[in-house]
Amino acid sequence: MTALKLDGVTAIPSDITRLQLGLSEEWIDTERRRSAGSTFVHFASSLCFEEKNKGLICDHNINGLRHAVDVASALKCDAFIYISTAFTVGIHEGHVAEQLHRPAAFNNYYEETKCAAEHLITGLCGAKGLRLVIVRPSVVIGPSESCKTGGSKTGLYGLIREMHRLKRHLKHVSVVADGNPDAGVNLIPVDYVCHDIFRLFEDPGVQSGPHHATAHNNVKIADLVELIKRHMGLPNVAVQRLERLDTERDSAIERLLARTTAFYNSITCATKHFERSAGATWVLGTDDVERYVIEAVRACESGEGHAPNQEKIAAPEDRVASNVYAAGTICAEPAAFGNGVSDPV
C-alpha cells in the first residue's frame, strides 16, 4: 500500500449540533473563495445506542448531518463524503448490497439513525447539487502494521474491555454468553478504511451512493471468542444462542455480562456478507486477528490506551466528554486527529 499524504490538513474547531457547525459567517465567506470545488468529508457521529440517549444520538447523527451539508453547500463544495456504517441494514442477515436499506427492524437506535441519515443525506445532496459518496466501514480495528488499539474502547475493543472488567468473576465460574458461535463478524483495520476513503476521494468518476469499506472475509465468532479466552485466561466462558435472558436460570454474572455487552449482539449473533464492487481485497487471517486480540488484552492489563504521557477529560461545546491524550514533548502548536468518538486515527 502507498503512504497516505495529509499535507495541508488544517483543524478548525466546530460543533455539529449548532447551525453552520458554529462557524462564523466571516469564516465561511473567507473559506468559500478557497473551498469552491472541494470535497467535504463528514466523520462525526455518536456511537451511543441506548434508547435513553435518543435525543443526543439524533442531535449528532441527524441534525449534525443537516448542519454539515449546509456548510458544504455554503462553501460551494462539489462533493460530500459521508462516513456511515456497514450496519445500516439492521437485523438483516446474509448478503448486504451497496444500496440504501429499509430493514424491517434494527438492533439498536444507533443503527436506526445511521440508516435514516443515509436517506437524509441522499435527499439533501441531491437537492443541493452535491455529488454524494457514502462510505460504510464494518467493525474498525487498529492499524494493520502495529495492531495496537490506539486507545479505542469501542467495537472489538469494547467487547474485550467488558470481559476484562469482569475477568475476576468470570475466571471462577462457568458462564454462557449470548451469541451465535457459527456467525461471522467483519473486522477491518483502520488504515484499510482510510485507503478506501482516499480511493473514493481521488476518483472523480466514482459512482455516487454507498460503498462498503469492509474485509473480504468474516471472522467466525467461535474462533474470535476462543482467542479472547486463551489470551485473557478465561477457559470457562462459552458462547451459545439464547432466545431470551432467563432471570431464574442465568447467574448474576451472566445477566451482568449480557447487559454490558448488549451493543455487540448485532455482530455476535448474525452473519452479514458485505458486497464490495470495487477497490482492493482486504483479507484478515487467523494469525492477524490473534495479533489484534493480544494487543487489546495487553492494553487492558497494562492500563495503557496507547501509552500517553498525559490523559485528561475534555468537555467540548457539544456536551460529549472525550478522552484527550498527550504524548511526547510539545514544542510547537499541537495537532490532534480524531474520529467521531475522539479515538485517535
Task: Label the model's feature ranges.
Residues 190, 222-223, 248-282:
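Conserved C-terminal active-site "lid" loop/helix of NAD(P)H-dependent oxidoreductases
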Residues 39-44, 51-55, 59, 63-109, ...:
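Conserved Rossmann-fold NAD(P)-dependent oxidoreductase catalytic core, especially the SDR/UDP-sugar
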Residues 1-9:
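Glycine-rich phosphate-binding loop and adjoining beta1-alpha1-beta2 segment
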Residues 196-259, 293-339, 343-345:
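Mid/C-terminal beta-alpha module of Rossmann-like enzyme folds, strongest
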Residues 107-138:
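Active-site Tyr-X1-5-Lys
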Residues 143-156, 200-211:
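Glycine/proline-rich active-site loop of Rossmann-fold NAD(P)-dependent oxidoreductases
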Residues 5, 13-63, 75:
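NAD(P)H-binding glycine-rich loop region in Rossmannoid oxidoreductase-like domains
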Residues 53, 146, 156-192, 196-200:
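A conserved pocket-lining segment of Rossmann-fold NAD(P)-dependent short-chain dehydrogenase/reductase
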